[in-house]
């Protein structure tokens, strides 16, 4: 499958740059055009390379020196898709081989027709390496071709300089290199570029370039290859020397492309969700999601995690949110369990920062930061951008009240432990995380009469701030503390306090209309018509008509909140309750968060409303792949891509994991004939093949595995074939 751009359009330039990112979990390079265009945002990012600029509240994922720019002249005329006559154009990101390729047939001012092809690919074997290539072929007359490219340390984060130059060097006539250091975090960056031709070099102002000039005869090609090596002091000592040494090994573009193709061929064979149905778009959306989940996530480094935009852009400053554990980690848990473990180790290694945040708020245990970067301290700014009309700044309440993140982490620990049976992790790390987060909730609850409540919080719905007894928060806190008791994560006195908490914590239950209140006041607030706002999800257009404080006093939800609870704890709620609440809260939810629609789709599946579920799923697919030209300018929506995977696996395929038991009750939409996918469970690699008539489950291991299918238990040995009941 391919992501395709059929026509060059400046309006879409940054959206395609995000969509067409290449990477390998260590770095990501935005799919920006090789030439400079107005408003284009370039970007290369390395996992974990953060810096806190002078005077800034928050650390930022550093936009590293640019390496993809080609400044091309044909007979002295600058190559530009904006100023030249473009006769043919196509740009594709081939998801099956990881290559971004652009073809342009242009006509120069002198009337010469010239093909210009640019390609790039990230090395999937040596994660520090990428390959770039430009091929220029005159079709009608000979041409003079001049190309300049290099390493540009003048790159910034939205105008903020993050790097200082340490050294610029050349080696021979085909290798340039640069050394930089982040201004505050003092991370060393080494970059080298090796060419297949001899160049002329120039270095100035944090930038080093190589220039190449040739007279090219008609119907012959000028081919320039550039092999990039990126190293940082987070992984290596003396990254400058390491990058130079690697670049001197002289691999070719073709060699890197071939091993990338081999890697991706194996990846798709082992991990693809395959959908046969009416629309090829569904398959593209799932491949797009899996591709980006794979290139945004570090494979073997527990010191780093996944930011809200992955490695595709500067949005949210590259910070790590609850999204990672709840929406992204499950993909890896059931495909690459070791990667899921590393994501949990990232949190464990920053436990002291969470303990400090709890102390800062006068609580016990560990309160994990709402936004995390490299240190483990809270990175959420205290105030939002300046309101130019009022001259004031809106308080950002997330860090102070969106405390469910600690329970979310405990939930993820439990998901990992039951899926892998990794007792070593549980004993050495998991119990500590569960204990510390449980201790936080014991101190966070307040006594009201003869029971406990949790006040002044924000649930997943960020349009509803500082409310009491948010159902999602209370239930997840209860679940968190119950895990401490389950695993005896603490001394007898602590466990006694946990049991008291479990006995006395208020858990909202359905009222006489069978509705579970999202919080103490939500259902008593005024209701307004949300039709216009729901037609523009993700735009936060309601804030153009209402102040945030006014929205807070309405039955308006930004995203799945109570419905998120139904999704995470399905065993707690009957199907009639789920149906009643899903319908009610869907009408109150604008889906201004990219995380929302896929979760509502899962719950629609669980109440057998398949066409509604499929409609919600397809709308979720359009968040990054839809027609809005600016939906992804600052990067793709990382967690929403994880949510698409969740929707197919836990929604349409009907998989549930409860108390260490794996169950499946498939519910395919009418548009799908067949779906197949792999799933790793307790060290067994399973393959599910689901049609409207049959359920086939295969496994390669010898041990018998119990599994529930449509409520009936089976013992899976090698293969289980069952006829479908109903749809």
Predicted regions and their residues:
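Active-site core of glycosidic bond-cleaving carbohydrate-active enzymes
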Residues: 321-352, 402, 428, 482, ...
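Acidic/histidine-rich catalytic neighborhood
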Residues: 436, 440-493, 497
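Inter-helical turn/loop segments and adjacent helix faces that build the functional surface
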Residues: 141, 234, 274-275, 334, ...
